[in-house]
């Protein structure tokens, strides 16, 4: 019996080490801001049972943000601003986008079943981990699924009472059938 219990304990610790989210270059906190203004803070958020694809480390998210900013700039050029307007992302000292990794304590099914309202599950979840700065808009790249939509954002009338509607989510890989 002791051998069996020892085997279970060793297996648990080995599994924890193999599936650890800690990797070189990964940030688990919002790094100090390079300016004290309002910013868009980007987060790579996984559900408890989500598979880590290293999107925060392999430039997938950075390139996505670059493309979004490029599109936004092209749509504002010669309309509102002569040279266009850029989005103000939260940046690190080296001018790269500050991307925070967070694994939630909620399974994907519990989040994805809420469809377009899933962002109203994600926002309080990230807030419990301290991501609730009133000067930030949280842009979540959610590494799980959603049954209805590929993205959603909070509307003040749907946000939990006492919570600032400051979160948008992109469900990547996205919508799933079911």
Regions inferred by a protein language model and the residue ranges of each:
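Bacterial N-terminal signal peptides
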Residues: 7-15
């Amino acid at each position: 019996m002791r051998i069996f219990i020892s085997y279970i304990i060793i297996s648990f610790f080995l599994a924890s080490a193999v599936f650890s989210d800690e990797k070189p270059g990964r940030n688990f906190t919002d790094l100090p801001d390079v300016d004290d203004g309002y910013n868009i803070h980007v987060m790579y958020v996984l559900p408890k049972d989500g598979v880590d694809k290293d999107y925060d480390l392999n430039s997938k998210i950075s390139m996505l943000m670059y493309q979004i900013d490029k599109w936004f700039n092209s749509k504002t050029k010669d309309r509102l601003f002569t040279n266009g307007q850029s989005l103000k992302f939260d940046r690190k000292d080296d001018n790269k986008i500050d991307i925070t990794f967070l694994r939630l304590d909620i399974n994907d099914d519990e989040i994805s079943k809420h469809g377009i309202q899933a962002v109203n599950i994600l926002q309080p979840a990230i807030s419990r981990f301290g991501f609730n700065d009133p000067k930030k808009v949280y842009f979540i790249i959610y590494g799980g699924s959603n049954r209805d939509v590929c993205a959603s954002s909070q509307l003040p009338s749907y946000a939990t009472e006492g919570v600032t509607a400051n979160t948008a989510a992109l469900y990547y890989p996205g919508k799933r059938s079911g």
